[in-house]
């Protein structure tokens, strides 16, 4: 009689074995370039994020708070998303919406023998948390209560918007992978349009709900872009090493 297997542990084990096997097949220099780029990028990003947070703290009483209040009320009246639509569109940026995307992308890229992409996915997710928590630990800014009496705004950590950072980094990585894989300029154009709309609508949802000040969202977009540039640069440099070493390998080379 065939011995039964627990599907989830067996699947995770199989994915891990594939990842390990393919990882060992890559040039050591590729992983070295990947790690070094991430380490330097994380250090620089952390310094920039800390600096931006300290600047925003200093500017709060010098006009930033008044500017935020003015523009949040303007966005309340002119935001293309209603409050109820904001509830829907903020979902891709929360844990419930993002974790399945993260685990699926990591599992698929590991299973289909793209260890650099799988590792970059993990680094992207963990790194964005590190940067957000660095800023939150530096400044626990109060959330707005100007829309619906602040019903959709938790009490702490307004700057930056964590939803916006995670959407910019994780979905930004997905759109980047799609863009670099396509040979069609028309498709690449569609990727840019779709990425702009997707990230933009999630960002606007946080303002529609009154969950963040406008400067929180702007800072989230910038910090997320900073980390996205870091991880995609690390992936590009490592992929370039693989391509030089094994020109005919399956490593996904940017066009």
Tell me the role of every PLM-derived stretch.
Residues 1-97, 139-152:
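N-terminal transmembrane-helix/juxtamembrane module of multi-pass inner/ER membrane proteins
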Residues 33-41, 116-124, 187-194, 219:
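Alpha-helical transmembrane segments of integral membrane proteins
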Residues 51, 126-133, 197-206:
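Aromatic-anchored segments of alpha-helical transmembrane domains
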Residues 66, 102, 106-185, 190:
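Membrane-interface loops
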Residues 83-84, 100-107, 175, 199-203:
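Hydrophobic, membrane-inserted alpha-helices
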Residues 93-100, 192-197:
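Short hydrophobic alpha-helical membrane-embedded segments
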Residues 148-255:
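Membrane-embedded catalytic cores of phosphoryl/pyrophosphoryl-handling enzymes
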């Amino acid at each position: 009689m065939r011995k039964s297997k627990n599907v989830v542990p067996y699947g995770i084990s199989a994915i891990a074995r594939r990842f390990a096997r393919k990882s060992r097949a890559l040039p050591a220099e590729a992983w070295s370039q990947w790690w070094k780029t991430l380490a330097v990028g994380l250090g620089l990003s952390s310094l920039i994020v800390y600096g931006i947070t300290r600047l925003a703290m200093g500017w709060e009483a010098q006009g930033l708070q008044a500017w935020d209040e003015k523009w949040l009320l303007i966005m309340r009246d002119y935001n293309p998303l209603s409050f109820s639509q904001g509830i829907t569109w903020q979902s891709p940026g929360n844990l419930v919406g993002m974790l399945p995307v993260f685990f699926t992308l990591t599992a698929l890229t590991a299973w289909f023998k793209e260890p650099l992409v799988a590792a970059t996915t993990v680094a992207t997710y963990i790194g964005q948390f590190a940067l957000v928590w660095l800023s939150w630990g530096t400044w626990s800014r109060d959330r707005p209560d100007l829309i619906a009496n602040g019903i959709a705004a938790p009490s702490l950590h307004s700057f930056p918007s964590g939803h916006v950072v995670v959407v910019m980094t994780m979905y930004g990585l997905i759109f980047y992978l799609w863009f670099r894989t396509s040979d069609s300029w028309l498709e690449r154009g569609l990727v840019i349009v779709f990425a702009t709309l997707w990230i933009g609508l999630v960002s606007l949802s946080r303002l529609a709900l009154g969950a963040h000040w406008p400067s929180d969202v702007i800072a989230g977009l910038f910090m997320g872009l900073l980390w996205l540039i870091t991880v995609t640069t690390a992936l590009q440099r490592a992929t370039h090493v693989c391509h030089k070493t094994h020109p005919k390998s399956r490593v996904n080379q940017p066009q």
